[in-house]
Amino acid sequence: MSTVEKCIQNTDSAGILWYLGLLVFCWISFKLLRSLWRGLYTCILADLLGATVDWKKLGKWAIVTGSTDGIGKAYAKALAKKGFNIVLISRTFEKLETVAQEIEKSYSVKTKVVAVDFTKDVDIYDIIRREIEDLDIGVLVNNIGMSYKYAEYLTKIVDGVQFSDDCVKANITSCTRMTMLVLPVMEKLGKGVILNVSSLSALSPMPLLSLYSATKVYVKFLTEAVHDEYKSKGIIIQAVLPGFVSTNMSKMRPSFTTCTPEAFVKWAMKSVGVEMRTYGYPVHKLQGYIQEALIQYLPESLNLSIGHSMMQGIRKKYYKKFGLTDKEK
C-alpha cells in the first residue's frame, strides 16, 4: 500500500471516529436537554399554563391512607386546602382524631376517620367500604406503607418472616384493594384522581432494601397499567416516586436531597394530570433522571453494584451509631 493510500485510509478512519463522537455528543446533549425541559415543564410551566388537573371538578371527598404522619398527612392538608373533605385512614384512632381536628380547624372542611391496621386480615376492607360507600369520592391517596428500620440483608431482618408478611399487606395489598374500592365510584362519575405512593427505589433492584423496593415496583407497575386501562374514562392514576423525605419512618433530617413532607407534596401535586409518573420534589426529579440514565446506559450488574455499595454505606453508619455487631464484614 502506497504512502498516499495509507494517508487516505487514516483520514477516513479519523473522520468516521469524529462523526461517531459527534453523534454520541449530540445524542447525550439531546437527552440532557429533554430531561431539563421535562423537569422545567412538570415543575413550573404546566401549572402556570393550567395543564394540571382541575381539582374543583372532582368529587367532594378525598381519601388518604397513612394520614397521621409524613407524606400522608401533608397530602391530607394540601387537599383540604383545596376544599376537599378528608377521609383519614390509619392505625391509631387518637392520632387520627388529632389530625382531623387540626384539618377541620385550619381549612373549615369535614373529616371522617377510619382506624384500621393494614397489616391485619383483609376483612378491614369491608369496614372501609361501609365507611366510604355513600361519599362523593374525588381523590384517593394510597400512601400507607412500611419499610426497613435500616438497610439489611433479607435473612437478617429482625422478625423477618412477620415483617415480610406485613410489608406485602401494607405496601401491595392495601394499594390494590383501596384502588379496587374507589375505581367503580370514579368510573360511574367519569372523573377522579388516584395517587399511589411508590418510591425512587422502584426504578431498579435495590440490594439491602430488596423486599421494600420489590413491593414498590409492584405499586409502580400496577399504577401505570391501571392508568392505561382507565384514562379514557376520565380517571387519572399517578405513580408517585419520592426519594428521601424527612418522616418518622425514614428518621432522616431535612437536607438538600431530603425534603420535608410538605415540600414534597407541594411539588408533587403540580404534576397531577401532567405526567403518569412523578418524582415530585425537584431534587428528586434530578435524582430520578440520573437513575433512569444509569439504568439505560450501564450494565445491570454495575447498577446493582452501585446500589449495593450505597446502601452498604448507610447500613454501616446505622450499625456504628447503635453499636451493633456487623457479621457481614
Describe the residue ranges of each PLM region.
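Active-site helix of classical SDR
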Residues: 179, 215
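Conserved glycine-rich Rossmann-like NAD(P)H-binding loop of the short-chain dehydrogenase/reductase
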Residues: 82-98
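Residue(s) in the substrate-gating loop at a strand-loop-helix junction
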Residues: 199
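SDR active-site lid
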Residues: 221, 227-305
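Conserved mid-core segment of classical short-chain dehydrogenase/reductases
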Residues: 122, 126, 130, 145-165, ...
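Conserved glycine-rich cofactor-binding loop
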Residues: 61, 68-69, 92
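Catalytic Tyr-X3-Lys loop
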Residues: 137, 146, 155-177, 187, ...
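Rossmann-fold scaffold of SDR-type NAD(P)-dependent oxidoreductases
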Residues: 65, 115, 137-150, 171, ...
